[in-house]
Amino acid sequence: MPFGCLKPGEKKDYNSPTEITDKYDLGQIVKSEEFCEIFRAKDKNTLKMYTCKKFLKKDGRKVRKAAKNEIVILKMVKHPNILQLVDVYETRKEYYLFLELATGREVFDWILDQGYYSERDTSNVIRQVMEAVAYLHSLKIVHRNLKLENLVYYNRLKHSKIVISDFHLAKLENGLIKEPCGTPEYLAPEVVGRQRYGRPVDCWALGVIMYILLSGNPPFYDEADDDDYENHDKNLFRKILAGDYEFDSPYWDEISDSAKNLVSRLMEVDQDQRLTAQEAINHEWISGNAASDKNIKENVCAQIEKNFAKAKWKKAVRVTTMMKRLRAPENQTAAATAPAAEAAAASPSEADPAAGAQETPQAASEASTAPSSTAESLSASIEVPAVEPANAEAASAAVQPPAEPVVHVPEPEQPVPTSRCNGEASALDTVEEQSG
């Protein structure tokens, strides 16, 4: 039975806060995130350390849904390369999640500390993450926020395993997903293009991760000023939609053709042509001996220190808010010049969310194969395109803002949290299907 569900006539039985403190010593706050506070916790009996995430119910419906979503997802998974949920408590005021504690370093820090670093080291990292992602995908779970900051070593031993953390954006794939979320630099074209999407977005993100680990550079580099976030985001999205990246010299000169081939097949703009996680595991660069053992540390480390010390890769931002902001100038012009035309051009899905949810398989197929035309639309203007221009009328409506009930855009009066420190853009995933 999904978390939080009760049988008819059954009364909710809450834990008392003392039950938690009787079992665990809770330390000081380690980090505050958008929906929760993170503590270190020690089991009083075993003295084992854990990570504790506390969600306050008073912070609103979105926080309560975020907590329930993460609990539902984590209760489903058990894999050596995923941090495991150990304990869950619900009081009248909070949710407490206790998870395994990873004491190792982030992948970047590990690379910088190595005396020798090669493609084979990268292949070992990618293989472990791919196996975890293939497992998630077998359960129809989409992580939606795979990035280097969420890949950590389990401990500080020499041959420590890699684990994936942070499942607050993960979602069960019950049909294609619509709301955009994730970290901008890792977004797949179908997310940027406001199309329906699914598990292939995780494979795209793994391609971005692999590109960075082999070169020290992000694939969609932009020369915009560090503080010019708006132009940076526009240019970034254009490049993602077009798949506009290269294996630049001299950074890729020493990298094998097999590695480049795998990156290209993971970062395929057409999600239907993109490798699945299991197909990537079977690639010769992962499962064979194609990965080079040549030392590439000097070049990679120099580029990592140059590119990833910048705040733009860690900035906290909501994807939906950012997309609305990038479209704002044209939307304001359109509203001022043709309010009547705007209403006339609205598609059935914009006028009626239920109608949008009942689109035909043909329309969904067209949406999943439209990145190239979407890229042309974005090149002609500065907006992020709307979803699924399946015909001329829908294409003319594509410049209008997405319907609020369909894409869960945060309310204007709600400020973007400033406490988030891991660069995630957030969209809330409801779990009403599971808790119903």
Curated annotation (Swiss-Prot):
Quaternary assembly: Interacts with calmodulin, in the presence of calcium.
GO terms (BP aspect): signal transduction
PANTHER family: SERINE/THREONINE-PROTEIN KINASE
Family: Belongs to the protein kinase superfamily. CAMK Ser/Thr protein kinase family.
Bilayer topology annotation: Peripheral membrane protein
Region (Disordered), start-end ranges: 328-436
This protein's GO CC annotations: cytoplasm; cytoplasmic vesicle membrane; synapse
Name of protein: CaM kinase-like vesicle-associated protein
Domain of life, source organism: Eukaryota
Lineage, opening ranks: Eukaryota, Metazoa, Chordata, Craniata, Vertebrata
Cofactors named for this entry: Ca(2+)
Domain Protein kinase: 24-286
Main location: membrane
Domain notes from UniProt: The protein kinase domain is predicted to be catalytically inactive.
One of the record's GO molecular function terms: calmodulin binding
UniProt-listed InterPro entries: Kinase-like_dom_sf (IPR011009), Prot_kinase_dom (IPR000719)
Gene name, Swiss-Prot/TrEMBL: camkv
Comp. bias (Low complexity): 333-409
Subcellular location as annotated: Cytoplasmic vesicle membrane
Record keywords, A-Z: Calmodulin-binding, Cytoplasmic vesicle, Membrane
Described purpose of this protein according to its UniProt entry: Does not appear to have detectable kinase activity.
Source species of the chain: Danio rerio (Zebrafish)
